[in-house]
């Protein structure tokens, strides 16, 4: 298993305007499910064959958060979202790349640029492949959502030994009635329950960032305490 580690220089934080960020990376050519799981438990995130985590000098606002699946009960509003999507077709498959995917990705980010002032980058086929398709091995999948044969949402996930790592989701803003972002996460929870998995790893919760603060609304959940190196001691998560 080839592994190469490196770090970025300090740059503007993408989440908090008054902060600087620095990212540590691991490039892992043929990552096993076990290693992936151990890294995710320690606060890393996977995009393609790259794993990353923040190592910012004067900030610890990025908190890894995971949902406790076995204790999770769907609220009345969440059941309404599920019922609204009774005719939405959901396909679990290995990550795909098509014109549909790239068009939907671009449409979603144009919408978020206007709504939340996100920085938008034009993504090529190769860049999308490197970020969301490459390195899926025996754990990477996408949930593809179709309404009347139209691809309206893509949710990229890793199905690991103890849970599901939620990587990235994008959807068609013209179908906002269906609450597709929320519906995709509820699907992850349903799948985890059926597979007897314990956690949904939601990535980073940042209290002062609107785009990431919503994650704390999914309870019960746990926050990772401190950082540990791979296979170093026991990892501590707390409610």
From Swiss-Prot:
Compartments, record wording: Cytoplasm
Species name: Campylobacter jejuni subsp. jejuni serotype O:6 (strain 81116 / NCTC 11828)
Catalytic reaction equation(s): N-terminal L-glutamyl-[protein] + L-leucyl-tRNA(Leu) = N-terminal L-leucyl-L-glutamyl-[protein] + tRNA(Leu) + H(+); N-terminal L-aspartyl-[protein] + L-leucyl-tRNA(Leu) = N-terminal L-leucyl-L-aspartyl-[protein] + tRNA(Leu) + H(+)
PANTHER family reported in the protein's UniProt record: ARGININE-TRNA-PROTEIN TRANSFERASE 1, ARGINYL-TRNA--PROTEIN TRANSFERASE 1
Residue intervals passing through the bilayer: none
Taxon lineage: Bacteria, Pseudomonadati, Campylobacterota, Epsilonproteobacteria, Campylobacterales
Enzyme class: transferase
Entries under InterPro entries matching the protein: Acyl_CoA_acyltransferase, Asp_Glu_LeuTrfase, N-end_Aminoacyl_Trfase, N-end_Aminoacyl_Trfase_C, N-end_Aminoacyl_Trfase_N
GO biological process, alphabetically ordered: ubiquitin-dependent protein catabolic process via the N-end rule pathway
Pfam families: ATE_C (PF04377), ATE_N (PF04376)
Record-linked HAMAP family: Bpt (MF_00689)
Function in brief: Functions in the N-end rule pathway of protein degradation where it conjugates Leu from its aminoacyl-tRNA to the N-termini of proteins containing an N-terminal aspartate or glutamate.
One GO location term (cellular component): cytoplasm
Cystine connections: none
GO molecular function: arginyl-tRNA--protein transferase activity; leucyl-tRNA--protein transferase activity
Gene name linked to the record: bpt
Protein name in the entry: Aspartate/glutamate leucyltransferase
EC number(s) given by UniProt: 2.3.2.29
UniProt keyword terms in alphabetical order: Acyltransferase, Cytoplasm, Transferase
Family: Belongs to the R-transferase family. Bpt subfamily.
